[in-house]
Swiss-Prot record:
Protein name: 16S rRNA aminocarboxypropyltransferase
Gene source species: Methanosarcina acetivorans (strain ATCC 35395 / DSM 2834 / JCM 12185 / C2A)
Enzyme class: transferase
UniProt xrefs under PANTHER family: 18S RRNA AMINOCARBOXYPROPYLTRANSFERASE (PTHR20426:SF0), RIBOSOME BIOGENESIS PROTEIN TSR3 HOMOLOG (PTHR20426)
Residues annotated to bind S-adenosyl-L-methionine: T26, L73, L97, S116
Keyword S-adenosyl-L-methionine: yes
EC numbers: 2.5.1.157
Family under the similarity heading: Belongs to the TDD superfamily. TSR3 family.
Subcellular location: Cytoplasm
UniProt entry keywords in alphabetical sequence: Cytoplasm, Ribosome biogenesis, rRNA processing, S-adenosyl-L-methionine, Transferase
Function field: Aminocarboxypropyltransferase that catalyzes the aminocarboxypropyl transfer on pseudouridine corresponding to position 914 in M.jannaschii 16S rRNA. It constitutes the last step in biosynthesis of the hypermodified N1-methyl-N3-(3-amino-3-carboxypropyl) pseudouridine (m1acp3-Psi).
InterPro entries: RNaseL-inhib-like_metal-bd_dom, Tsr3-like, Tsr3_C
Amino acid sequence: MMNPTNSRDVPLYIYHAGQCDPKKCTGRKMARFELARLYDKISRLPRSAILLDPMAEKALSPADDPKKGIIVLDCSWEEVERVFPELEKLNLEHRALPYMLAGNPVNFGRPFKLNSAEAFAAALYILGYKEQAEKVMSKFNWGHSFLELNREPLDEYATAKNSSEIVEIQSHYI
């Protein structure tokens, strides 16, 4: 059970398909530290939350309301295609993260190749939950790299009023 240290923390949820190396899985590590809840069934995910979806038409922005939580899918693209019909039933707010570089050792410096922890941290930072983003990244010895690599764009994204402004800011980094 997730037990946020701060009652104002945004609830974080992970659909975990069990397809990754357990020793490298950022989602499992977040769950061990009670920073996120893992689900192995789509039907159990909370309704009306924000789903971080790289194919979403709308970018995540500070205008989005994270009270119902943020969901990350920790699975292969094939699995995403398989579960997408179920996701549609949950009334989720699909949002894409803007341009950022991975800070993890597997994809270091590669644009848009974020792992689950980095995706959560980026979303939290953009939504104004910088301390919670830093808490998530503090559990990984490379976590500071992600925040340092992306500090400037994250600070700018956090000042945007809406999705359109996020896209405009993003264009300066691509």
